[in-house]
Amino acid sequence: MNTKALFPGSFDPFTAGHLNILKRALTMFDEVIVAVGINQDKRGFFDMDQRIDIIRQAVKGLNGVSIIKYDNLTIDTCHEYGIHHMVRGVRNMIDFETERSIADANRKLAPDVETIIIPTAQEFAHISSSAVRVFLKLHGESSFFLPEGVILPETR
């Protein structure tokens, strides 16, 4: 049986912490679809094509990973792809409480989709996409937050 999970996020950009969660999800599922969300109300630091390119660089050599973009409810994307598991990563208890609330709401909308919350490994707990963006704006150096081998594109 081929088990699939959706790993949704804005991934602006995809970090070493995201990769840690993805690799751990791949030990539980045959396929993990990284779903890059489009938020019409937010202007991303990196555009959609750049974010997808960063993820492609990060997952190079990993089997069972595909990348999509979506602009509807995450639950609707799960149904569109026949997925019954959604993976979410958390760094700390604040993240956990937020994700648990979202999972509860999603369960009401779609009881057939289960949210799997994976705590990031401790060495990645300090990493966030927001921190990467701050470092890029202020210092220009953020490689220590990124998956090995990822080269960030020029930003707008």
Q: Which stretches of residues belong to each language-model region?
A:
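Nucleotidyltransferase catalytic core that binds NTPs
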Residues: 1-156
